[in-house]
Amino acid sequence: MASELQRPKTPLPLFSDYHTHPQGHRVQRYTQALLQPWADSARRVGLKDIAFTDHDRYHAGIEFDEIDQLRERNQDLRIRAGIELDNDPIHSAAGRKWIEQHWDKLDFVLGSVHFLDRADQMFDSVPEGAAQFDGRDIDAMYADYFRRIRELVETGLVDCLAHLDLIKIHGHRPNADIASLIGETLEIVRRRNIAIELSTAGWRKPINELYPSDPIIELAIGKGIPLTTASDAHSHVQLGENFARLARKISAFGVRHVCIFQKHKRAELPLQV
């Protein structure tokens, strides 16, 4: 358990946010006017390394030249070009093709599952998505969700998984023991040598919990799965949100390193001043 792990005497500082959405939830072309506030906010909260990971359905807005210009203007920061690939039944095929075509320009690809039965609505939409769970077999929904996660991992296109237990967002819990389901999923993650994120976004959602939950974090640590830190910011003011709280959580688990990415190559950096 976390209490049995070695604990640093003080919470460790966090320096990277690897889940951000400058475009929000619509196509917006990358410009300096759009991106510079993110660099300013990163600097203000003490971040040194950030990854832009807009949803793949908005890839038309991503301009690598603009990211390069931003890097030139903010050389004290490490700014990564990334994207979040999900299982959007309408757009993800085009998103995967775009990622393959621009693989060498990307530093980082997040993978996530936002869609279950409905092609026209993400199940994690708040509050509308909660209706997708009404009258449903929650155990079956959890099994379906993690099956889709495993399928995404097996594409070989993702460097890290986002909000691994997003299925809990509206507060629905499985009745069945899902330890084997989680274990199977994490074993594929380990075999594929990818990371998972610790996301503070869950603390501002109805579930009011970190993504993923403590038991999943423990299993991941036990399997040696690398970790990133993330806010899932959809506004630059959310960068690094609740990272002080996340630092305390990480400290309790005895985690001493988090990973960063450059051109899909992972490096683990110590959580030290």
Mark where each language-model region is:
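A structural motif
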Residues: 47, 106, 157-158, 225, ...
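Domain-core and long-helix interface of multi-subunit machines
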Residues: 25, 61, 113-223
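An N-terminally biased module of ancient metal coordination in phosphate/nucleic-acid-related enzymes
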Residues: 1-89, 93-101, 160, 168-180, ...
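Conserved, mostly hydrophobic/aromatic
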Residues: 19, 42, 109, 163, ...
